[in-house]
């Protein structure tokens, strides 16, 4: 190759690098601008003195679709959004220690959105908050409340089988229905969370009882439950697996823990375009930003009410006559991604 040819090749390489850098910067700027747009349009649930992130209904008399918000607010808290942290705090009764699905539902005293007042999914959001903030006081109040729940003997035989294995009555997150049960995988996560708060943050030992016995019995099997969760069904079940990976990384202090499990999630065809899964799997910043911008709203492409979707918990399947999840995004899922990417609105 002649000297002139080498010079030309070098110039082309430099120009290409500059163009790519400019493109990346352009995407960064666009994400920052979109962040301001999402912030301006994201719905809030106002109840009593509380003003917290929510999904939305189209009912002006009850505009808050907040039945799952304690989990989503825990995710926002993890990503550094203090509004999410405060919403998780406000969803707990400060006297009893009981946690609810949202601050509004706590004030109401029951879940008018259907189902029980709490669930294993919400417990993941609570644990993200507890570990992120090292809040041993609220953790102890919650554990004490859980431990004091009267055992409900209305569960199927499987729970009674768990009881025999642990020599403890299985614990419950609430008492309204069978879905409140602390399953073995939930117990393993609780065991990891309470062990972390005890070992690293000085939380007292849990009182003897169902929650301590259940958590201690199953925490040793946490790797097995993580493997089982990797086979979860598409949609929200796989999203729960992703949230569990996030929690365990936070506890371990290792952003690369369970990386293969995260890559497996992101690589599934039904999850193509899921920016949260891509971020969790360690995809490049440019790729994650690109996926976020493709599915998060722009001023000229507005979502269609009701804004009731946290799109990262949905796969790409859509039933006839229905919209894709990102087309009905609540905006907070997009704010969550921007916060994960440490982007601030201008």
What would you call each of these model-derived segments?
Residues 1-8:
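Bacterial N-terminal signal peptides that target proteins for export
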Residues 8-16:
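Bacterial N-terminal signal peptides
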Residues 24-48, 136, 235-346:
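Terminal, non-catalytic domain-edge segments
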Residues 27, 32-63, 92-112, 148-165, ...:
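Glycine- and aromatic-rich loop/turn segments at beta-sheet edges
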Residues 62-80, 117-132, 163-178, 234-250, ...:
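Well-ordered alpha-helical segments within folded domains of soluble proteins
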Residues 79-169:
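Extended ligand-binding groove/face enriched in aromatic
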Residues 84-88, 140-143, 189-193, 256-266:
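Alpha-helical repeat scaffolds
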Residues 174-193, 210, 214, 226-232, ...:
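Eukaryote-biased recognition of C-terminal alpha-helical segments
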């Amino acid at each position: 190759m002649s000297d002139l040819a080498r010079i030309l090749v070098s110039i082309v390489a430099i120009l290409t690098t500059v163009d790519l850098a400019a493109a990346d910067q352009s995407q960064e700027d666009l994400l920052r601008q979109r962040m301001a747009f999402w912030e301006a349009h994201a719905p809030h649930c106002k109840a009593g003195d509380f003003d917290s992130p929510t999904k939305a209904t189209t009912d002006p008399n009850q505009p808050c679709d907040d039945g799952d918000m304690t989990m989503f607010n825990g995710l926002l808290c993890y990503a550094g959004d203090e509004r999410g942290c405060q919403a998780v705090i406000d969803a707990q009764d400060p006297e009893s220690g009981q946690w609810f699905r949202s601050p509004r539902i706590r004030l109401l005293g029951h879940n008018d959105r259907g189902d029980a007042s709490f669930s294993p999914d919400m417990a993941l959001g609570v644990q993200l908050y507890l570990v992120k903030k090292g809040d041993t006081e609220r953790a102890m109040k919650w554990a004490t409340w859980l431990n004091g729940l009267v055992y409900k003997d209305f569960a199927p035989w499987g729970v009674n089988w768990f009881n025999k294995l642990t020599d403890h009555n299985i614990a419950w997150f609430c008492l309204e229905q069978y879905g409140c049960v602390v399953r073995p995988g939930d117990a393993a996560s609780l065991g990891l969370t309470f062990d972390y708060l005890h070992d690293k943050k000085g939380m007292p030992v849990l009182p003897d009882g169902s929650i301590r016995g259940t958590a201690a019995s199953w925490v040793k099997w946490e790797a097995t439950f993580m493997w089982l969760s990797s086979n979860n069904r598409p949609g929200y079940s796989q999203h729960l697996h992703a949230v569990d990976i996030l929690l365990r990384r936070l506890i371990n202090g290792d952003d690369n823990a369970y990386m293969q499990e995260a890559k497996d999630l992101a690589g599934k065809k039904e999850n193509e375009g899921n920016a949260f899964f891509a971020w969790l799997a360690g995809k490049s910043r440019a790729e994650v930003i690109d996926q976020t911008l493709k599915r998060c709203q722009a001023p000229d492409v507005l979502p269609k009410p009701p804004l009731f979707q946290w799109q990262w918990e949905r796969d790409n399947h859509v039933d006839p006559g229905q919209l894709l999840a990102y087309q009905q995004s609540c905006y907070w899922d997009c704010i969550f991604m921007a916060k994960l990417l440490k982007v601030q609105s201008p």
